[in-house]
């Protein structure tokens, strides 16, 4: 019988091979339970290793984001339908921090606060994900604002110019045209986009927070009709969305824009509006049982907006030279810009455009209050011709408003004051502009030059806008080289002389045509009781003798 031999080396090798090839089928995951849920908020017990802003998954697949990390429980904002979440259900960690998909495929699309498409055009092929809570560029990564972002609005580009990388607040009561100013700015980027020049192209993001779904649909229709959706992304969180979505939507829009900014591209982001985001954040914070402060807002409501708007920047050449311009919108109550949220955002931004209800009701649109509107850094980026002609415009309008208020009570004014009132009324008329009809910068320069230099003083106030329209058309056909020179940034004696000659020639044609129309019009029949008004008026002006007494 053969002797049994045991080789320890073989046994050890067999065991090592078995152990090295073994794969455990058991997965490790942290699981917690829902302590209570309601109003879009859930309090979860357990999960001690959860990170701030980490995504958590409920039993029905709904996601939530961890905002409050207390010793015993976690405060979670539910991102979706919270009707199926009940006490006692299991919650597990995902290990992922809240992020949004980004990429060029988002242009022309409408997405929700999580970056998911809601326009029915299918999935979006993203280029990756970016965290929503990324640090803003530091001081060394930035450079000063030195490139203009033209809005196409004469009053804005002349008096409160905006530069690429600037944060310019649009503030005013409801129904004063705040959204219209922002949409005009988006529409004015169309020619730059179609030029194909990456240095001129501006990608636009419109963030709609707390608006009616029908309003968002109409805004999309305006952009599509003007051909602006091809370079615009809409991030929509309508009034029907939970408060958590309204709180996150501006960060999603900013994240999509940051992807392009760090890629060396230029971006414009409109936040419409941050008042509703602050209200949504207040609701979320109170439901999370955070201590309330002034007007029941949480103590970090300033940080809510500062960390969002600080992401707007003009990057240095070493960082690619991209930019992200922010146009936050804030709604005031009774024109009170000293309220809590308005003063917060005013202190964060680089200037504000204040739209006033009284001016809007008077037909001055855009209804910009010159006295309280300012741009702190955009002047450095203003084009040279506009800077030359618009220097006195703000002062003239401010003096006109002051004199207008005085003239309402004064019976007689000196000649200089009357002349100032006449010119001021023409400047106000000149700066009026229809909705969704932005002006090229060279035509803005011509209009502002004509008004500030007194070339319109002999044109009736009611005819100013018609004169402007026809004169610009005349220049486009007869003096195209002058407009091209201004567009190229040229301004000097030669261009001024050409404009002087052109406006004199056109004025003769315009006034001659007007006189001819007046002659051909049949005399208007006086209304009852007005037969003697002309005589009385002429007597008051001193142009006729006193009527004989009976």
From Swiss-Prot:
EC number annotated for this UniProt entry: 7.1.2.2
Compositional bias ranges of the Basic and acidic residues kind: 528-550
Membrane-topology descriptor: Peripheral membrane protein
Gene3D superfamilies reported in the protein's UniProt record: 2.40.30.20, ATP synthase alpha/beta chain, C-terminal domain (1.20.150.20), P-loop containing nucleotide triphosphate hydrolases (3.40.50.300)
Cellular component per GO, a single term: plasma membrane
Alphabetized CDD domains for the sequence: ATP-synt_F1_alpha_C (cd18113), ATP-synt_F1_alpha_N (cd18116), F1-ATPase_alpha_CD (cd01132)
Record's keyword annotation contains Cell membrane: yes
Subcellular location: Cell membrane
Subunit structure: F-type ATPases have 2 components, CF(1) - the catalytic core - and CF(0) - the membrane proton channel. CF(1) has five subunits: alpha(3), beta(3), gamma(1), delta(1), epsilon(1). CF(0) has three main subunits: a(1), b(2) and c(9-12). The alpha and beta chains form an alternating ring which encloses part of the gamma chain. CF(1) is attached to CF(0) by a central stalk formed by the gamma and epsilon chains, while a peripheral stalk is formed by the delta and b chains.
Name used for this protein in its record: ATP synthase subunit alpha
Originating species: Salinispora arenicola (strain CNS-205)
């Amino acid at each position: 019988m053969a002797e049994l031999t045991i080789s320890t080396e073989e046994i050890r090798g067999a065991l090592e091979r078995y152990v090295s090839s073994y794969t455990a089928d058991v997965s490790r995951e942290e699981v917690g339970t829902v302590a209570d849920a309601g109003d879009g908020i859930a309090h979860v017990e357990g999960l001690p290793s959860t990170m701030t802003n980490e995504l958590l998954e409920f039993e029905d697949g709904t996601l939530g984001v961890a905002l409050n990390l207390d010793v015993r429980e976690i405060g979670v904002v539910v991102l979706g339908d919270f009707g199926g979440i009940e006490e006692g259900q299991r919650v597990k960690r995902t290990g992922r921090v809240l992020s949004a998909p980004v990429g060029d495929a988002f242009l022309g699309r409408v997405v929700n606060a999580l970056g998911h498409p809601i326009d029915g055009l299918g999935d979006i092929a993203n280029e990756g994900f970016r965290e929503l809570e990324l640090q803003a560029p530091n001081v060394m990564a930035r450079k000063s604002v030195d490139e203009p972002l033209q809005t196409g609005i004469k009053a804005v580009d002349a008096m409160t110019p905006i530069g690429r990388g600037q944060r310019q607040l649009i503030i005013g009561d409801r129904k004063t045209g705040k959204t219209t100013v922002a949409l005009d700015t988006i529409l004015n980027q169309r020619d730059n986009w179609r030029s194909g020049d990456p240095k001129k192209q501006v990608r636009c993001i419109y963030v709609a927070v707390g608006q009616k779904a029908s309003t968002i649909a109409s805004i999309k229709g305006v952009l599509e009709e003007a051909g602006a959706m091809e370079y615009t992304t809409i991030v929509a969180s309508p009034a029907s969305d939970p408060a958590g979505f309204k709180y996150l939507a501006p960060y999603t829009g900013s994240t999509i824009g940051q992807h392009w900014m760090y890629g060396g591209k230029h971006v414009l982001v409109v936040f419409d509006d941050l008042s509703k985001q602050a209200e949504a954040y207040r609701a979320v914070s109170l439901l999370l049982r955070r201590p309330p402060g002034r007007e029941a807002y949480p103590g970090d409501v300033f940080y809510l907006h500062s960390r969002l708007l600080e992401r707007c920047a003009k990057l240095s050449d070493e960082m690619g030279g991209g930019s992200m311009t922010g146009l936050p919108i804030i709604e005031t109550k009774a024109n009170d810009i000293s309220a809590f949220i308005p003063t917060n955002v005013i202190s964060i931004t680089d200037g504000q455009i204040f739209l006033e209800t009284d001016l809007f009701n008077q037909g001055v649109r855009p209804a910009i209050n010159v006295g309280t509107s300012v741009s702190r850094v955009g002047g450095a980026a203003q084009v040279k011709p506009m800077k030359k002609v618009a220097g006195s415009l703000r002062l003239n309008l401010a003096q006109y408003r002051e004199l207008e208020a005085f003239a309402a009570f004064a019976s007689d004014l000196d000649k200089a004051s009357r002349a100032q009132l006449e010119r001021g009324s023409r400047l106000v008329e000149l700066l009026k502009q229809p909705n969704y009809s932005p002006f090229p910068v060279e035509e803005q320069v011509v209009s502002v030059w004509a008004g500030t230099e007194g070339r319109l003083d002999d044109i009736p106030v009611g005819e100013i806008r018609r004169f402007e329209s026809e004169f610009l058309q005349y220049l486009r056909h007869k003096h195209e080289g002058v407009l091209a020179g201004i567009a190229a940034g040229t301004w000097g004696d030669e261009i001024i002389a050409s404009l002087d000659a052109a406006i004199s020639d056109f004025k003769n044609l315009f006034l001659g045509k007007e006189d001819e129309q007046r002659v051909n019009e049949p005399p208007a029949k006086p209304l009852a009781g007005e037969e003697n008004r002309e005589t009385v008026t002429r007597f008051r002006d001193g142009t006729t003798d006193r009527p004989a007494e009976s």
